[in-house]
Regions:
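Active-site loop/helix belt of alpha/beta enzymes
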Residues: 2-5, 11, 175-255
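A charged N-terminal "starter" segment
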Residues: 1-158, 162-166, 207, 243
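A cross-domain feature marking catalytic cores of carbohydrate-active enzymes
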Residues: 79-81, 102, 125, 144-146, ...
């Protein structure tokens, strides 16, 4: 435990802690070196006061990569910007071997200014024309919620006279299995898996404009059984996409 934290606990007789707080070593070192400064900052800016240590993202990314290494896995890690809006953290993340996903036009502008090159950015979420236009102009990967978004992206690409294919994922929803129960609220984003024939037909019809990266899905449920079914369904469609000659590059299991 940090010496400064220990002193505060000992001075406050009303504080009864059964367990010491778990403090990151970087944070602990800062507290030990600057115990008075912390109180000065609270006096100046008020409470609650959030102090950010951007360099901690390096440790987190390294921990993720270690999981890949231990399990002989390959893949690309994505930092998600929606719940992590600190520009300083995004800038630090850009110095690591990670990509990033965004869910709005404003967020896309932000991550571009933080040092992420377009090939490291993926656009998710509902996309109006302004958001979609910026994504197409910058050449970032588009994670489409529906075929309408893809059609609009193609039209924007052609109107701008762009020759390079658009990198796209197609987000799936509506997963099903006889052994697991799903509700209509589960997996509300994406194209229903029952519409797979329409997806394949669209992708093949627009193969000159779209570079199909693969399928994606977002799953917020804590149910391990549902997550397994979602992965199974997505892998089945990935295999079918290969048979259809679409050459998917991977599977996005995060968004």
């Amino acid at each position: 435990m940090s010496n400064a934290v220990q002193q505060i606990i000992e001075q406050d007789n009303t504080t009864k802690l059964s367990l010491p707080p778990v403090i990151n070593p970087i944070t602990e070192a800062f507290i030990d070196r600057n115990p008075d400064m912390i109180f000065d900052l609270v006096d100046a800016f008020g409470s609650p006061l959030n102090l950010i240590f951007p360099q901690m993202i390096d440790r987190n990314i390294a921990a993720f990569k270690e999981v890949y290494k231990k399990n002989n896995l390959s893949g690309q890690i994505y930092f998600t910007s929606k719940p992590n809006k600190s520009v300083s953290i995004m800038r630090q993340a850009s110095t690591n071997d990670v990509n990033i996903d965004v869910s709005s036009e404003k967020a896309l502008h932000t991550v571009l200014s933080c040092g992420f090159r377009p090939e490291r950015i993926e656009c998710t979420g509902p996309k109006n024309l302004d958001y979609l236009s910026l994504a197409v102009q910058q050449g970032v990967t588009i994670n489409a919620d529906n075929l309408t978004e893809l059609q609009q992206a193609i039209e924007i690409k052609k109107s701008l006279g762009l020759q390079e294919k658009l990198r796209v994922f197609v987000r799936l929803s509506g997963f099903n299995s006889p052994r697991v129960k799903f509700t209509s609220q589960d997996g509300t984003f994406g194209v229903h898996v029952n519409k797979a024939p329409e997806i394949f037909a669209f992708l093949k019809a627009n193969i000159e404009d779209l570079d199909f990266q693969g399928f994606a899905y977002y799953w917020s449920s804590a149910s391990e059984e549902q997550r397994i079914v979602a992965l199974e369904n997505a892998l089945e469609l990935t295999s079918e996409a290969i048979e259809q000659g679409l050459n998917p590059k991977g599977l996005n299991i995060g968004g």
